[in-house]
Regions:
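Histidine- and acidic-residue-rich, metal-dependent catalytic cores
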Residues: 1-188
Length: 188
């Protein structure tokens, strides 16, 4: 039924958001971010695609080289929505800028979100993640300084050397909280 299709679409969205939060959290840790910075990063990761309204928009974002016009609409809608909720309004710019290409003026959280989002899009979910690390790193290395922040790509290289990062990601054992509040979420 149509409502079941909507539920599946929501689950795909939630799974993507949690994987991006896991990836972003580990990148932020490699960048030596504070607990407060990591918390803002994780919340922004969980909300980054809240502006997506249709499955067509989801499919457009799955393109490895997304066209800026196709991604900017969901970023702007997400920005407006997040800004309208007082509890999350401070995260709105991160949602707006999470597909922005690298520039020296790009704020750090959107730069990390951009890399984390693309890592999740690139990963072939039906293939062992550890077998894909070399290709993923080549993709980002080729585009660092142009599309992606060199500092964040270097953090990705360091994270990628840890097999448990990829295993946790593949087996949905997400870790994305800082400090004493750290927890792991095992989804079944």
């Amino acid at each position: 039924s149509l409502s079941r299709a909507g539920d599946i679409n929501k689950q795909v969205f939630l799974d993507h958001a949690e994987r991006v939060a896991h990836i972003a959290y580990h990148l932020g840790r490699k960048l030596d971010w504070t607990e407060a910075e990591l918390n803002e990063l994780v919340l922004s990761a969980l909300l980054h695609d809240v502006g997506i309204l249709t499955s067509d928009e989801q499919l457009a974002l799955a393109d490895l080289e997304p066209v800026r016009e196709r991604v900017s609409a969901h970023c702007l809608r997400g920005y407006r929505l997040v800004r309208s909720i007082s509890l999350f309004s401070g995260l709105a710019r991160n949602v707006l800028e999470h597909h922005d290409y690298y520039s020296p003026n790009l704020r750090p959280i959107p730069a990390v979100l951009h890399v984390a989002d693309r890592v999740d899009i690139i990963l072939k979910k039906d293939t062992y993640y550890l077998w894909q690390v070399e290709d993923i790193l080549a993709y980002f290395t080729h585009r660092q300084g142009d599309v992606f922040s060199p500092e964040v790509v270097e953090a990705l290289r360091r994270v990628a050397q840890t097999p448990s990062f990829w295993l946790d990601l593949q087996h949905r054992n997400y870790q994305y909280a800082a400090g004493r509040s750290s927890f792991r979420r095992k989804l079944t």
